C-alpha cells in the first residue's frame, strides 16, 4: 500500500496482482475468475503494448498471461510474444555469444539447452534456456485454456529475435563475448571478496570459462597490470587501446592508479608523450587541499572525476590539455584491469565513460580497505 500510494501521488496508475494458490501448475484455477480474474485489468489504448520489468523472475510472463485472460473476457483477441535477445536461437549452443548469456545469468543458474519442443514440431535444432523450456508445457496449457488453442508449438516460437541474422563480423562477436565472460567472472569474485557470498556463482563461471576455452588471463590488460604492480610495489591499472596496444598507469603522489591510467590512455590516443605533465600543479593542488583540509579526506590523490575536472580547467589555457581531453570518446569500449579493487567513485566514472572495468579481488590496504 505504501508503494502504491507513492505511485498514486506521482500520478502513476498502479494495478494489483494477487498470489494464486497452486501457481503455475493448477491450470484450471489459474485460468478462472479466482485466478487471473482476481488481478486488476490494465486498460490499454494501443494495438501493441510493451511489458518490461527490472529483471528476470519479476512477473513479465504472468502479467502478459493475466492480461490475455482479461482481454479475451472483454472480447479482444489479444496475443503474446517475447522479445528476448539471449540466448540467440539460431546460433550454435556452444557459440561464445550464447555462452556469454550463461555467464550473465550465472546467479540464476540458467543453462542453454536444445529446444526439444521445436525439434519435435519442426525437426529443426534451436537454442533456448532451461527455464523457458521447463515452463513451456504449463505456458502452452495456460494459453490453450485462455485462447482455445496455443499459437506456439515451442518456446522458440514465442520469441522474436533477429540478432543471429545481424552479425556481420563473427570473430569480433566471439572475442567480445569471451571478454564479457571474463568480466562476469571478475565481477563475481570481487563480490565474494566484498561480501563473503557467491562462491557457487564463481564456480559456475569457472566452468563457463572452460566451456568457452578461455581463462581469467584472456585480456592482456590483466597480465600487464599485475606485472607492473610487481615492479612498482603499488596499485596499477592497464587498458587495451583501440589499436591493440596496452597502456598502464600506477599510483603516484598526485594521482591514484585509475586517474594515472586514464591520463596515460588519453595521451596515447591523442598522440601526446606519456612523460609529459599535461595537468598543471595549479589545477591539482587546490583540489588536493580542498579534499584534505576541508572535506576530511586523508588521501590527497585525485580520483578520476577530480582528475578530469582538473584536465578540463587546464584545457582552457593549454592546447595540449584540450587535445588530450578530446580523446575521451576514443576510450569508449576499451577494457581496463586493475591490480586492486578501485574505489566506487573511480569505477562509476570509468563506466560512465564506457570503459569496461575489472579488478583483481584484493583491496589496496589491510586486506579489506581501498582508498
Put a short name on every predicted segment.
Residues 63:
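Hydrophobic positions on the alpha1 helix immediately C-terminal to the Walker A/P-loop
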Residues 55-56:
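The conserved Walker
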Residues 1-52, 67-229, 234, 241-243, ...:
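Flexible phosphate-sensing "switch/lid" loops adjacent to ATP/NTP-binding sites
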Residues 79, 251-253:
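Residue-level structural signal for beta-strand termini and adjacent loop
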Residues 268-300:
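Short HxH-centered metal-ligating active-site micro-motif
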Residues 254-270:
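A short, polar/charged loop-to-alpha-helix boundary motif
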Amino acid at each position: 500500500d505504501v508503494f502504491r500510494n507513492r505511485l498514486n501521488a506521482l500520478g502513476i496508475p498502479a494495478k494489483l496482482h494477487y498470489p494464486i494458490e497452486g501457481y503455475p501448475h493448477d491450470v484450471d484455477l489459474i485460468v478462472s475468475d479466482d485466478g487471473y480474474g482476481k488481478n486488476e485489468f490494465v486498460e490499454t489504448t494501443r494495438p501493441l503494448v510493451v511489458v518490461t520489468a527490472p529483471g528476470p523472475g519479476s512477473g513479465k510472463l504472468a502479467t502478459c498471461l493475466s492480461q490475455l485472460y482479461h482481454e479475451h473476457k472483454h472480447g479482444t483477441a489479444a496475443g503474446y510474444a517475447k522479445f528476448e535477445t539471449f540466448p540467440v536461437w539460431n546460433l550454435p549452443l556452444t557459440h561464445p555469444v550464447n555462452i556469454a548469456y550463461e555467464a550473465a545469468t550465472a546467479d540464476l543458474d540458467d543453462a542453454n539447452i536444445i529446444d526439444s519442443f521445436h525439434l519435435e514440431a519442426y525437426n529443426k535444432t534451436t537454442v533456448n534456456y532451461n527455464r523457458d523450456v521447463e515452463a513451456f508445457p504449463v505456458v502452452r496449457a495456460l494459453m490453450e485454456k485462455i485462447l482455445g488453442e496455443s499459437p506456439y508449438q515451442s518456446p522458440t516460437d514465442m520469441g522474436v529475435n533477429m540478432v543471429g541474422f545481424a552479425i556481420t563480423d563473427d570473430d569480433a562477436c566471439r572475442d567480445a563475448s569471451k571478454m564479457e565472460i571474463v568480466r562476469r567472472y571478475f565481477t563475481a569474485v570481487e563480490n565474494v571478496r566484498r561480501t563473503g557470498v557467491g562462491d557457487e556463482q564463481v564456480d559456475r563461471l569457472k566452468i563457463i570459462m572452460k566451456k568457452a576455452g578461455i581463462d581469467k588471463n584472456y585480456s592482456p590488460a590483466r597480465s600487464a597490470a599485475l606485472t607492473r604492480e610487481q615492479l612498482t610495489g603499488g596499485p596499477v591499472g592497464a587498458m587495451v587501446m583501440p589499436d591493440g596496444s596496452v597502456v598502464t598507469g600506477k599510483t603516484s603522489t598526485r594521482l591514484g592508479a585509475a586517474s594515472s591510467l586514464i591520463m596515460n590512455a588519453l595521451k596515447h590516443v591523442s598522440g601526446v608523450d606519456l612523460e609529459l605533465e599535461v595537468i598543471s600543479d595549479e589545477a591539482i593542488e587546490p583540489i588536493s587541499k580542498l579534499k584534505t583540509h576541508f572535506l576530511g579526506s586523508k588521501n590527497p590523490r585525485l580520483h578520476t572525476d577530480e582528475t578530469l575536472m582538473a584536465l578540463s580547467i587546464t584545457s582552457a589555457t593549454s592546447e595540449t590539455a584540450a587535445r588530450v581531453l578530446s580523446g575521451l570518446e576514443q576510450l569508449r569500449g576499451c577494457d581496463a584491469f586493475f591490480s586492486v579493487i578501485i574505489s566506487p567513485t573511480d569505477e562509476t566514472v570509468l563506466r560512465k565513460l564506457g570503459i569496461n572495468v575489472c579488478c583483481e579481488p584484493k583491496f589496496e590496504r589491510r586486506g579489506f580497505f581501498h582508498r
